[in-house]
Amino acid sequence: MARQNRFDRTSFQTQIIDLSHDGRGVARPHGEGGKVTFVTGALPGEVVIVEPVARNRHFDEARVVEVLQASPQRVIPRCSHFGVCSGCVLQHLAEDAQVVSKQRVLLESLERIGCVSPERVLPALAAESWGYRRKGRFSVRWVEKKGRTLVGFREHDPRFVADVSVCHTVVPQVGEKIALLATLLDSLDGRCDVPQIEFIAGDAVVALTVRHLQPLSEADRLALIEFGKEHGIAIFLQSGGVESVRLLWPDEVLLAFRLKPWDVEFVFRPLDFIQINGGLNEKMIAHALDLLGAGFGERVLDLFCGLGNFTLPLARTVGEVVGVEGDIGLVERARENARRNGLGNAEFFVADLTRDQRDAPWMRQGFDKLLLDPPRSGAIEVLKQLPLKMFERIVYVSCHPGSLARDADFLVNEQGFVLRAVGAMDMFPHTAHVESIAVFDRC
């Protein structure tokens, strides 16, 4: 006997009252006290017809079938793949409204999770919203039914690769060549052995790193070289872990970007972490240094420093700066970049900041101010170990409002700091990702 549907999939009309933290519309079709329904593709204030797609204990999920009354902030998505590809979720919302929404998510998270409110809300930072992604990873899959290779981000259903020919958020040197890249992979003998391609862009060079599960034939290597020559793209191969990455073409290449306001150049490797949005990154650094307010006579501790994205600009403006990072490769590059830029007042240490560091040499040094830029999980482990009373000011750059709110709760409600200011930064336009910056002062 055929399996019965577990819930009623009949379409119905509803009004959208809010936007969720992941970019979906929020409806309460059963009234104020009823279960919430998250609606993909809907915006606040809209009246829509929706089709249920999933039912959960505490909430339901649906998708828009028809918009009966559109929001004045609704715009036509630039990408024809919007709604299928998971790379963007907010292209149907005007760009200024996206930023307002992210600012709201940030403030709501601080209040709801951290039980804190800032004295001042900083104007949100934004930069170029198209062609900004200078680092990313495309999935690759040969699809027998289509008879061709798909290259792109995953669909919202992560089992599938989005069938795209162009991506408007990726740097044009890569985003406009996805179809050509797919054609190249179609021609390879080992087309089924390439699961992903990573891209990264410096100021002068764009690089692709081709991950392959089996050794590539000489013909395949030559095809990749010809593609690199034709389009001016450096080609790297990766047969295993990060340590297996090798340059295929050209014979030598220098991946680098310069932060002109501080006359600092960063040299990096193809799989290194760099901030995805170069234009916003420069604004963010200037904003963070201005908020930190550290001068030539002061010592600054920079945690989760990576390549030294904040550390090296800080070294131009303060007496001494110490950067701490868990990735030994990034620390090696940070030290080398400090030497290349003649910054002898920047020192770097390798440390896993999720573990006990109370006996680490840098932990015993004295500092005036603290800057930190942790991963999504936040910084609670290291914050609980630091002698926080030595810091006059803390500037916290966050990539997740939930972990920032948790850490703000600790700093304000347990350690007695004051949350002076906070603001969103639109590092990832057209996505629901919320980057932010917060300023804490010692009482």
UniProtKB/Swiss-Prot annotation:
[4Fe-4S] cluster binds at C79, C85, C88, C167. Keywords: 4Fe-4S, Iron, Iron-sulfur, Metal-binding, Methyltransferase, rRNA processing, S-adenosyl-L-methionine, Transferase. It is an enzyme of class 2 (transferase). It comes from the Bacteria. The keyword Kinase does not apply. Belongs to the class I-like SAM-binding methyltransferase superfamily. RNA M5U methyltransferase family. RlmD subfamily. Catalyzes the formation of 5-methyl-uridine at position 1939 (m5U1939) in 23S rRNA. This is 23S rRNA (uracil(1939)-C(5))-methyltransferase RlmD. HAMAP family: 23SrRNA_methyltr_RlmD. Its EC number is 2.1.1.190. Disulfide bonds: none annotated. It comes from Xylella fastidiosa (strain Temecula1 / ATCC 700964). GO terms for biological process: rRNA base methylation. PROSITE patterns: SAM_MT_RNA_M5U, TRAM, TRMA_1, TRMA_2. GO terms for molecular function: 4 iron, 4 sulfur cluster binding; iron ion binding; RNA binding; rRNA (uridine-C5-)-methyltransferase activity. InterPro entries: 23S_rRNA_MeTrfase_RlmD, MeTrfase_TrmA_AS, MeTrfase_TrmA_CS, NA-bd_OB-fold, SAM-dependent_MTases_sf, TRAM_dom, U5_MeTrfase_fam. The active site is at C399 (nucleophile). S-adenosyl-L-methionine binds at Q275, F304, N309, E325, D352, D373. Residues 4-66 form the TRAM domain. It catalyses: uridine(1939) in 23S rRNA + S-adenosyl-L-methionine = 5-methyluridine(1939) in 23S rRNA + S-adenosyl-L-homocysteine + H(+). Pfam families: tRNA_U5-meth_tr. The keyword rRNA processing applies.
